[in-house]
Amino acid sequence: MYRWLAKVLGTILRLCERPAPGARALLKRRRSSSTLFSTAVDTDEIPAKRPRLDCFIHQVKNSLYNAASLFGFPFQLTTKPMVSSACNGTRNVAPSGEVFSNSSSCELMSSGSCSSMLKLGNKSPNGISDYPKIRVTVTRDQPRRVLPSFGFTLKSEGYNRRPSGRRHSKSNPESSLTWKPQEQGVTEMISEEGGKGVRRPHCTVEEGVQKDEREKYRKLLERLKEGAHGSTFPPTVSHHSSQRIQMDTLKTKGWVEEQNHGVRTTHFVPKQYRVVETRGPLCSMRSEKRYSKGKADTEKVVGLRFEKEGTRGHQMEPDLSEEVSARLRLGSGSNGLLRRKISVLEIKEKNFPSKEKDRRTEDLFEFTEDMEKEISNALGHGPPDEILSSAFKLRITRGDIQTLKNYHWLNDEVINFYMNLLVERSKKQGYPALHAFSTFFYPKLKSGGYQAVKRWTKGVNLFEQELVLVPIHRKVHWSLVVMDLRKKCLKYLDSMGQKGHRICEILLQYLQDESKTKRNTDLNLLEWTHYSMKPHEIPQQLNGSDCGMFTCKYADYISRDKPITFTQHQMPLFRKKMVWEILHQQLL
C-alpha cells in the first residue's frame, strides 16, 4: 500500500516540477550571529545511508505542498522547534519560528534522489561564524542555487570598509552569482509589535563593528593625549639647549612664542594641535608675559633687548679672580702667565679709564647716618603740602619729594628743580655753560609758536651758551633734547628708544626765530643737524617708572661732558641722592 501511494505521489511531483508563479514570500528569521551557515560542503565526510521513514514522511508533505500550490490552495508548513530531516544522511537544522512559504523549501529539502548537504560554520571566539553564507548542492538536473546570508563577518573576504566608515560587500571571485550587501538582501522586516512598514534589519555584527570602531577611536584619543603630556623633555644643564628642544617639541603640536632678551619669534602650525601643556623655563616665561601689564611689559622687552649694551662696562672690567690667582702663583715660578694677565688688565684699564672710574665712584657712594635720616623723614609720613625746599622760584613739598620713591613717576616740580641745580653747578669753573628750559616750554612752543615763548629768554642769550637742555613730556613719558651750540647739532635722548625728529625740527626752527630776533641774523640750517640717539648708544630703562630719572641723569652726565655710563640698577641710589640734593639744594 505504501509503495502504491509513493508511486502516485511521485507522479504528481514530476508533473509539478516547474517554477511556482509569483514572487517568493519573505523569510522571517530571528537569528543570532552564531547561526550562520558554512560555505563549504564536503561530501566525503558523511557516508551515504539508506532512506528512513522520516525522510519518506517529509517527501509526502512536500508533495502535498506542491499539489496545493498547483491548484492555488493556501498552505503553510510551519516547522516545529529544531525540526531535523535526514535525507541520505544529511541533517538540516532550522530555528524555531521560521516560515517557509514558497517553492524554495522544496528545492532545499529535496526528494529521495537528491543529496543536499549543509554544514554549520565554525564559531569564532567572539561568537561570529567564520562562514557567512550557505551553499546547497543538488545531484539532480536542477541548477545550483545559493541562499544569500544576511550578515558578514569581519574575516569575510566580501567585507570591506570605505574611508567614510560605511560597509559594503564585494562579489566573491569564486562564486558565479553576485552577492548583495546586507542592507539590500532584506528590504522589509515585519515588526513583532505590529510594525508599521519598512525598516532596516537589526544586525548583531553591525553593532560589534560600531563598538569596535568607537573603541579604536577612544584608544587613538588616549594615545594622542599621552603623547601630548609625555612629550616634555627632562631639564638639561644648558638653558639654550633646553629651549631648543622645547621649541622642536612645540612645533609639532601647536603654535609657540619664544621671547629671549626682547627678541620675539612666532611659529605658525596647524590649528588642530594648537594648545599643548609644556614644562620648563619657556612656560614660565610665557606666563610672565601673559599676566604682565601692557606698558610695563613693552618697556621690559625694550630694556631686555639692550641689556647687553648697558653691561658692556662690566664685561670690560678686570677679572679680580684672575688677578688673585696670578698673585697666588708667584711662588710657583709662573712669571710668564702673571705678566700676560697683568698686561691684559692694564690694557683694559687703559681702554676704559674714565667710564670705570665714574661708575665705581657712583657705586661706592655711601650715605651717612644723618643723610639716611633726612631722606627717610622726607619720604615718610607727613602733610603732603609741607614745603621741604624752596629755591629758583620753585617750592618743593613733601608730596613732590615722595615722587622720588622707588617705582614712582617724577613730576614737573622735581625735574625743573633738578635742572636748575644743574645750571647752578655749571657756573663753576670746569663745566660747560648751560641753560635749561622748563618742562612747560616745549608744550607752549608747540601750541603757540615762537611768539608764545618769546619772553622766556628775556634775560638770557642762548647763543652765548654751550649747551641748552629741553625736557620733553610726551603724554606719560619723559625725554630730553640737548642743543649743542658748539657742534651745531640737536640730540634727542629717549630711555625707551623712541625717535624725536619732529621735536628736533620744531626746536631748530625756534633757534632760527630766536637768532633773527636777538641777533638779526639767520642761522645756516645746512650747518645744523639733528639726531635721535639710538637705543644701543644710551642706557635704556627696564621698567615703566624711571623715565623721569633717566631724563635727569642724561642731563647730569651731559652737563659734565661725561659719557653716559649709568645703568638701570643704579636708579634706587640716584633717587635717594636726588632727595638729599633737593633738600640741600646742592648736587653731590
Swiss-Prot record:
Gene3D superfamilies: Adenoviral Proteinase, Chain A. It is an enzyme of class 3 (hydrolase). Keywords: Activator, Cytoplasm, Cytoplasmic vesicle, Hydrolase, Membrane, mRNA transport, Nuclear pore complex, Nucleus, Phosphoprotein, Protease, Protein transport, Thiol protease, Transcription, Transcription regulation, Translocation, Transport, Ubl conjugation, Ubl conjugation pathway, Wnt signaling pathway. Its EC number is 3.4.22.-. The N-terminus is necessary and sufficient for nuclear envelope targeting. Residues 394-558 are annotated as: Protease. InterPro entries: Papain-like_cys_pep_sf, Peptidase_C48_C. Protease that catalyzes two essential functions in the SUMO pathway. The first is the hydrolysis of an alpha-linked peptide bond at the C-terminal end of the small ubiquitin-like modifier (SUMO) propeptides, SUMO1, SUMO2 and SUMO3 leading to the mature form of the proteins. The second is the deconjugation of SUMO1, SUMO2 and SUMO3 from targeted proteins, by cleaving an epsilon-linked peptide bond between the C-terminal glycine of the mature SUMO and the lysine epsilon-amino group of the target protein. May down-regulate CTNNB1 levels and thereby modulate the Wnt pathway. Highly expressed in testis. Detected in brain, heart and thymus. This is Sentrin-specific protease 2. The modification Phosphoserine is found at residues 32, 332, 343. The lineage of its organism: Eukaryota, Metazoa, Chordata, Craniata, Vertebrata. The active site is at residues 477, 494, 547. The keyword Transcription applies. Residues 172-184 have a biased composition (Polar residues).
